[in-house]
Amino acid sequence: MSNEGQCPFNHANGGGTTNRDWWPNELRLDLLSQHSSKTDPLDPGFNYAEAFNSLDLDALRKDLAALMTDSQDWWPADFGHYGPLFVRMAWHSAGTYRMGDGRGGAGRGQQRFAPLNSWPDNVSLDKARRLLWPIKQKYGQKISWADLLILTGDVALTTMGFKTFGYAGGREDTWEPDRDVYWGSETTWLGGDLRYDKGGACESQHGGNAGRNLENPLAAVQMDLIYNPEGGPDGNPDPVAAAYDIREVFGRMAMNDEETVALIAGGHAFGKTHGAGPADNVGLEPEAAGLEQQGLGWKNSFGTGKGADTITSGLEVTWSDTPTQWGMGFFKNLFGYEWELTKSPAGAHQWVAKNAEPTIPHAHDPSKKLLPTMLTTDLSLRFDPVYEKISRHFMDNPDVFADAFARAWFKLTHRDMGPRARYLGPDVPTEELIWQDPIPAVDHVLTTRNVAPLKETILASGLSVAELVSTAWASASTFRGSDKRGGANGARIRLAPQKDWAVNEPARLAKVLKVLERIQGEFNSTQPGGKKISLADLIVLAGGAGIEQAAKRAGHDVVVPFAPGRMDASQEQTDAHSFAVLEPVADGFRNFVKGKFAVPAEALLIDKAQLLTLTAPQMTALVGGLRVLNVQTGDEKHGVFTDQPETLTVDFFRNLLDMATEWKPIAGEDTYEGRDRRTGELKWTGTRVDLVFGSNAVLRALSEVYASADGEAKFIRDFVAAWVKVMNLDRFDLACKKRWYIDASGLPGEPALSARIQWR
């Protein structure tokens, strides 16, 4: 396109210098408004579960199976079968998951968007998704891209002779890139220096190299990799050194050593890598490619640019002599040869079998045979002593290996979906797995008539409003919208490790739980017909009762909606190691920070709020309400800007915004003193999290709404709505929970238990 004779136009919408250019440390409140209805093209009433359940899954599987061998001239299938390509596609969709914060994974179909669609580790997966488009087009919104990517991998394995463990749908698409996922600080493709230069908070947690401390919550060795470089750490083709990184990154995605070996060896039973020529033949990634590429990228100028001339990783390895059929070829070759270092046609380090005959088929020329080859990370399974023992056991026991791979693959592709209650479809396995955070099925009923007497008993128990509300918050606020883990259901707050977390003040928590357990026991022992209440429900009900009491003290009659149906998990149903990652390093809602961090406390509050799926107004209402209710960790009264604590007022906002108060930092601390501007008398103390609601322009604007003369009634409604949202975040049994609100316009009276929760 010629620019000759054109007028300059440099002020396109969104262009120019942005606020973030001027103020790089600007608080990322935008993270609380992503994936809203404004970006969703589907109708407001669209119900994905209903759409998926109407899908003819058998017909879809048949169409996918037919695609596997329907090689297209524009992107020919290796060995005449797309199965290995689709296995890689599914693996890389799910494999971004990291258990540190639950982000990444396959659950939102993010492989379609930047940065994932343009990562160097995802070269050629643009073609895989484009091959799928006719099938996605045929079935429309009955299956999301997120579900289709994983189902295609499942079908690919099946068509290559492998029996999978099962498949569950239920992943709803998003329609824009995630903005909340921290992939690292590096600014170059495949950079890895900054993530290993963060100090003590980055220590290896999974038996990795103590000299390579990977920053949390990252689970990849380099920027834009799923895991670690297959050529070895920092280009060093050392299988033993590579094993350190493998153990670290797979551990961070919740895989143990056996699962790690099963996934690597099982995945490498199929297909090949691609490094037919030098990398400088490969063009720009999809996000940078020209419009004429129509969303594809990495245009290859080497030879035909496809088929035998494909360049992906730069490595040219085929692991098995049956690359489209499940078998033991990977282990047979791994242990059947000695290996010597060589280079691929692209110049990358890889390994070739010594004194071997050509037994490996050529991907596009049936008349040719190739020498067995391996990656540095493949040899880690032989030369790391722990991995070697597992690998030899698998090699000697093919059925054990097949079962281990099936289970590990299912875990890989479903780990970020949360509990089984979210699973859809006829292929959901019946076996309950510990990593699914199982909760017993509901075995009791509770009626509306039971609720009011229980509240009276709770309020007469001697527990304070702060104790009731704090315990309910501690139970429910473990929920993570990223991988749908945590929450109040299961009452795991009474179990290890949650009962011992510092943020939960174990001694105080034990006192509250003892009282609630007594109330539970007395109630259950006197009820006929199997009627009872779980501790999980009672904790939430008690929190609501505390809020009602606090509102009453402020002159408001409020009914906090309550939906029973939670159950109590056992310690045996709780993997303490897996749950340990849910321990908050900071909870700004309780003014808690576990230690010193490079990230300011207010940014950690935003991170917590985003994991709780809160909007900025919901976060603001909750912080203001919890402060005046004296919901704090520890004995400090930071942020309790009220003379009547445990009363639900707007005092937090009015006193924070009061210009009669002058704030000054306390030397050496992240806390502040608020003194009377005229007399110098100390009035309040607060943290960075408290003061940000008066300092940040957006949060101040929200605070002003509640601090206004007509703001109290709205604050009460908004606080109750946000509270009930958090209490019910893990209630996947409640219908149609896509977006919802609480109608608090007519609060007096005791409604049906869940009638006040309206879904939209």
Swiss-Prot record:
Post-translational events: Formation of the three residue Trp-Tyr-Met cross-link is important for the catalase, but not the peroxidase activity of the enzyme.
SUPFAM superfamilies given in the database record: Heme-dependent peroxidases
Q: What class does this enzyme belong to in the EC scheme? A: oxidoreductase
Q: Might you name a Gene Ontology BP term for this protein?
A: cellular response to hydrogen peroxide
Q: Which reaction does it catalyse?
A: H2O2 + AH2 = A + 2 H2O; 2 H2O2 = O2 + 2 H2O
Cross-link Tryptophyl-tyrosyl-methioninium (Tyr-Met) (with W-91) maps to 227-253
What organism is this sequence from?
Answer: Burkholderia cepacia (Pseudomonas cepacia)
- Cellular component, GO, one term: cytosol
> Which residues are listed for heme b binding in this entry?
268
Key words of the record? Heme, Hydrogen peroxide, Iron, Metal-binding, Oxidoreductase, Peroxidase
**A GO molecular-function descriptor:** metal ion binding
**Name used for this protein in its record:** Catalase-peroxidase
